């Protein structure tokens, strides 16, 4: 073939060379199987996660097409001493009696494919294979191990992958003393009760590819370095729970430990509950919630962990909320739960950064009687983040001026003040027990019956009456002048006397 053909298609030559290299790698022995999967993983890249391609020589891939699968039997490969069982181990005793598993030709490796039961409980059969060094269980439907693994004198590698295994006890592999490598990738494990109890000389644990729930306790990965280092692929563990979906487990655990350290380092927060409720998608910044309810606080905490966005401090004795204005630790706190405290004044928040940027403010069950309605109105009008404001169960007093403005505010922001219909007030100074819902009170009830006016007719109503009378007087005068001019041809004498 002319050389010019290869010169025009250099990419084709590279592709052929790469394909040949893959074939060579696939034909290598078991010691290179890890390199093979690594090579294939670099070629077969998926945007969300990399799924390893199983090695057909050491895997159960396509096991259901094997002749032994119909009867749940095993077959012995004399070439490498591998015992393959498909859907069960029904003929294992027969193989022993036939001498195919004798000391002269012991089974060194075992593949258990397609185990159909929910629980794998035939581990005692493994003791019939005393020279077994490697055990692989794949493509099986069991969800847990009924019993712990028995003592095995030479079993140093266990691979359990592509199964429905969802629970594993920390003691499952404790008695396998020669164990050095344990591969639990690509199962359905959600959590571990704690670090697995493994032999002293254990070397490598693989856990990637499982749907881990990072709301559970995996802090031991960082708190117990000698245990955490055994998890070779710890950087690849991904959370799948709703709260931390697609986040790295190590990152989530690091943030949890840092939050715990900050909360325990400050005296105000030692009895509080500190939680991480979210991690921002792009920046991976953690957002924290601090709950100090029912702890007899007389003031807001002086310190909050970095990135705290929610403070729940209900059912305490707090009366001063000035830290929302002055304390820089509260700058990023957008949700404040202050229900059932002793707050009587919120006017200090007027024109503050916090009031113009808050998202949730719960002031139910406090001692509020009045507030600057215009300041709150301006803040809610400018605040695009405001989502919830709760004001009910306060001893509001509706004077004529405040009550009217409060009613307008509740009507205007009913989508934000969601308990607006439950906001009640007293509207008579001589009867503090007479409560009415602000949205149902008329202006006449708030003004005419108020002791503030001293009479049943408010001065504003008197002024309105006078102005109305003057208007009617002017209109009457114009009508008289028009009539007089029409019938007498001249304006009234009083107009003639005017300069």
Swiss-Prot record:
Biological process, per Gene Ontology: intracellular signal transduction; pupariation; response to ecdysone
- According to the entry, every stretch annotated as the LRRCT domain falls at 210-265, 394-449
Q: Give start and end residues of every LRR repeat.
A: 154-175, 178-199, 307-328, 332-353, 357-378
User: Superkingdom, according to UniProt?
Assistant: Eukaryota
Q: Among the entry's GO cellular component annotations, what is one?
A: plasma membrane
Q: Which residues form the signal peptide?
A: 1-29
The UniProt keyword set, sorted, is: Leucine-rich repeat, Repeat, Signal
Function (record text): Has a role in the ecdysone induced cascade; probably indirect control of 'late' ecdysone genes.
Name this polypeptide is given: Protein singed wings 2
Q: Which organism does this record belong to?
A: Drosophila melanogaster
The coding gene here is swi2
């Amino acid at each position: 073939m002319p050389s010019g053909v290869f010169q025009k298609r250099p990419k084709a030559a590279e592709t052929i060379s790469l394909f040949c290299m893959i074939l060579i790698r696939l034909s290598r022995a078991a010691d290179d199987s890890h390199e093979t999967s690594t090579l294939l993983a670099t070629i077969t890249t998926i945007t969300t996660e990399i799924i390893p391609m199983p090695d057909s020589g050491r895997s159960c891939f396509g096991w259901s097409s094997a002749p032994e699968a119909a009867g749940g039997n095993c077959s012995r490969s004399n070439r490498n001493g591998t015992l393959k069982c498909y859907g069960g181990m029904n003929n294992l005793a027969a193989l022993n009696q036939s001498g195919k598993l004798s000391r002269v030709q012991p089974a060194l490796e075992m593949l258990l494919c397609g185990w159909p039961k929910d629980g794998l409980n035939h581990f005692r059969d493994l003791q019939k294979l005393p020279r077994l060094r490697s055990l692989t269980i794949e493509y099986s439907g069991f969800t847990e191990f009924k019993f712990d693994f028995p003592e095995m004198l030479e079993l140093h590698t266990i691979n359990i992958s592509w199964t429905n295994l969802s629970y594993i006890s920390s003691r499952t592999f404790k008695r396998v003393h020669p164990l050095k490598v344990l591969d639990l990738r690509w199962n359905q494990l959600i959590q571990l009760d704690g670090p697995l109890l493994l032999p002293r000389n254990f070397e490598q644990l693989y856990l990637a590819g499982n749907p881990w729930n990072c709301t559970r306790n995996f802090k031991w990965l960082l708190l117990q370095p000698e245990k955490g280092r055994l998890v070779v692929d710890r950087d690849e563990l991904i959370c799948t729970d709703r709260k931390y979906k697609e986040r790295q487990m190590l990152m989530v655990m690091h943030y949890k430990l840092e939050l715990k350290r900050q909360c325990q380092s400050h005296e105000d927060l030692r009895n509080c509950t500190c939680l991480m409720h979210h991690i921002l998608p792009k920046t991976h910044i953690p957002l924290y919630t601090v709950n100090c309810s029912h702890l007899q606080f007389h003031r807001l905490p002086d310190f909050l962990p970095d990135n705290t966005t929610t403070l729940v401090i209900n059912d305490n004795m707090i009366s001063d909320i000035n830290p929302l204005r002055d304390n820089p630790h509260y700058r990023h706190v957008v949700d404040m739960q202050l229900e059932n405290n002793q707050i009587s004044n919120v006017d200090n928040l007027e024109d503050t950064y916090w009031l113009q940027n808050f998202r949730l403010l719960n002031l139910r069950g406090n001692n509020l009687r009045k507030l600057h309605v215009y300041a709150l109105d301006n803040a809610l009008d400018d605040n695009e983040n405001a989502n919830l404001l709760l004001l009910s169960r306060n001893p509001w007093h509706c004077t004529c001026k405040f009550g009217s403005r409060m009613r307008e505010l509740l009507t205007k922001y009913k989508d934000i003040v969601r308990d607006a219909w439950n906001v009640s007030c007293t509207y008579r100074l001589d009867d503090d027990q007479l409560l009415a819902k602000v949205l149902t009170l008329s202006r006449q009830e708030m003004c005419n019956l108020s002791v503030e006016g001293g009479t049943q007719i408010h001065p504003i109503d008197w002024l309105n009456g006078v102005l109305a009378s003057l208007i009617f007087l002017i209109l009457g005068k114009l009508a008289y002048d028009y009539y007089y001019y029409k019938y007498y041809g001249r304006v009234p004498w009083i107009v003639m006397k005017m300069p």
